[in-house]
A protein has these predicted regions:
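Gly/Ser-rich helix-loop-strand patches that form or flank binding pockets
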Residues: 18, 22, 29, 94-141, ...
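Acidic/glycine-enriched edge-of-secondary-structure segments
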Residues: 76-81, 121-125, 146-153
Length: 269
């Protein structure tokens, strides 16, 4: 199992951030000899219906496409660019459509995501059926991560995220399966121990870690464990809850989608 096709996004209005935005998708494309496609559109346009680009925006998109193609070509990568003018639907829908026929999306962001970025991330994760790697701009992955922390709660979303991350897990020097033991009750056969056995059969080097949630949230505890173990990436399932449920009980998924990231997180729903 590998990544044969990787999808990413470039905002043509942020040319100074292009190098950071493409660092991880290009590094992964190089590592897996994958084809990489960049969808190019202003992030703020995710809030609006598709319209013909004006001359200024069109020029920026052309420049972004040329710069991406030149960088990919220098690295010997099979690549493609698609601009907003080729989309028949909104940007979130268009990204999800393209992602369904890709193996992985890599989206790089700076700080806490705005509404437009949240819409794009939400569509990518919940409408595509494919894994999505969210990467903080300040902490891109220049290579395949060597230590990965997997959040395991025995949910369908969690196992989909793990299978989506298998090409990375198989290459990592160590994968840590972490269960927050006082978050959800797991039946026999659902524990992280069984999961370590499955991943070992796939050739992964794994170990199990039981965590106590404590007074903070689940994501907070997982990020603390990632820091303690020097993990370079977190893998977790994404679950869509109602706004009221998020407000009253909180949600690790909602925290990921609304807060600034401190390390790359791969999600799948």
């Amino acid at each position: 199992m590998t990544f044969a096709s990787i999808l990413t996004h470039l905002d043509p209005t942020k040319a100074t951030e292009a190098e950071a935005a493409t660092a991880t998708p290009l590094a992964f494309a190089e590592a897996f000899s994958a084809h990489v496609t960049a969808l190019i559109f202003p992030m703020d346009s995710a809030l609006t219906a598709p319209t013909p680009a004006d001359d200024a925006t069109g020029l920026l998109e052309d420049r972004a496409a040329e710069a991406f193609a030149a960088t990919a070509q220098r690295r010997g990568l099979a690549h493609e660019t698609r601009k907003r003018t080729s989309f028949a639907y909104g940007n979130g829908e268009a990204f999800a459509d393209h992602l369904r026929v890709s193996d992985l999306a890599v989206l790089t962001g700076h700080g806490a995501p705005g509404i437009a970025a949240q819409i794009l991330h939400h569509a990518a994760i919940f409408e595509s059926g494919r894994p999505v790697l969210l990467v903080p701009q300040a902490q891109p992955l220049a290579r395949v991560p060597q230590r990965i922390l997997v959040a395991w709660d025995a949910s369908p979303a969690a196992i989909r995220a793990i299978h989506g991350a298998l090409p990375l897990i198989r290459r990592a020097a160590e994968t840590i399966i972490a269960t927050v033991s006082d978050d959800k009750a797991l039946r026999p056969g659902q524990s992280g121990i069984e999961l370590t056995h499955l991943l070992a059969r796939h050739g992964a080097k794994t170990r199990f870690m039981a965590l106590q949630r404590g007074s903070g949230g689940v994501l907070e505890r997982l990020l603390a464990a990632a820091s303690d173990t020097e993990a370079e990436m977190l893998v977790m399932g994404a679950v869509r809850h109602s706004p009221l449920r998020n407000l009253v009980l909180g949600s690790a998924t909602q925290d990921v989608l609304s807060d600034a990231l401190s390390l790359p997180i791969l999600l799948a729903a």
